[in-house]
């Protein structure tokens, strides 16, 4: 759920469709929730959260969220390395596109 908060904050800020979705999703247009979601993932050291934290790289993030993300990754030290090494850039891009397309399809069905 924390990664969904980040996704919706990014989508709502960068696209016409995303801004339109603000009225349809609790997570949309919530930059504070994106920061909170990121902090929540970073506060945990179990496999699920470390995987989610490393996979956030699939999104293009900027400004304060990007700075926070970099700080959280660096604060993990060696524990995050295997998760980052296992990332496949092509798969991350494909996952991001698939996620966004699913959201677009769902929004088309709702209108």
Curated annotation (Swiss-Prot):
The gene is yibV. It comes from the Bacteria. This is Protein YibV. Pfam families: Imm57. May be missing up to 40 C-terminal residues compared to orthologs.
């Amino acid at each position: 759920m924390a990664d969904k908060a980040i996704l919706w904050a990014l989508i709502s800020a960068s696209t016409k469709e995303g801004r339109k979705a603000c009225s349809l999703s609790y997570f949309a247009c919530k930059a504070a929730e994106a920061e909170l979601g990121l902090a929540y993932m970073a506060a945990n050291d179990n496999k699920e959260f470390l995987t989610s934290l490393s996979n956030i790289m699939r999104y293009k993030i900027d400004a304060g969220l990007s700075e926070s993300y970099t700080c959280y990754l660096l604060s993990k030290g060696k524990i995050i390395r295997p998760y980052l090494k296992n990332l496949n850039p092509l798969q991350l891009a494909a996952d991001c596109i698939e996620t966004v397309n699913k959201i677009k399809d769902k929004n088309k069905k709702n209108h």
